[in-house]
Amino acid sequence: MKLKFKVQPYQTNAVNDVVDCFVGQPMTTGLTYRIDPGRKAQTSAFEEGFKNADLALTDVQILENIQKVQRRQNLPVSQSLTDFTTFDSKGARVPVKAAYKRDALAATRVHLDVEMETGTGKTYCYIKTIFEMNKRYGWSKFIIMVPSIAIREGVYKSLQITADHFTENYGKKARFFIYNSKRLHELESFSSDAGINVMVINIQAFNARGADNRRIYEELDDFQSRKPIDVIASNRPILILDEPQKMEGAATMEALPKFKPLFIILL
């Protein structure tokens, strides 16, 4: 049985609002870099990787784009890229804690907070955003970060069931996988593949104390004495935080800069 997806106008509008925050960014594809070969004795074609192009826009240009989107949607207008807010227990917007802002800005200067209610197709929207970002700007490396294993499995299932739908609409197929510290060949492919690549990771994979969870920060013999986090960071991935209100713990926030995200989208 093949599922049919009806695209809702509000979903398309939400995707365009996010993508329009980078109007003026040049289309760049195939930006290569040398993947750290570790202790490999010989070079190989797989040592060439493809990373996201850096932001070419100035802070002023990005802020102006964001403000245009906010005015279009009748939203409060941000006065700076550091104008971070969150919700209190009554649903009112309040400034974020100083420690949160410090760690967030250490990760990247650009944070896009997209408000969508549960049941409105949020996961569909950010998967579509991935394809639109690739279509308009050439960015191809994405990480979807989630607060739990259950949500991780749900996101992965959504990627599976929408795969044909997005291939039909964009003429491209995304490669996606769940990060597993014992299947690091998938991370190697994430770096070396030129197409759209999506890694799904739950925060326990990098902020917990267990031996398996700490492997992401360790030089591993079975990974040519490299640290997985360094290989991830070299891609300058776009980081999508699904349910970020459940990921505001100190261990998670302090880890975000290590991923070296190009920018962060919060949904």
Model-derived segments and spans:
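RecA-like P-loop NTPase motor core of helicase/translocase proteins
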Residues: 1-267
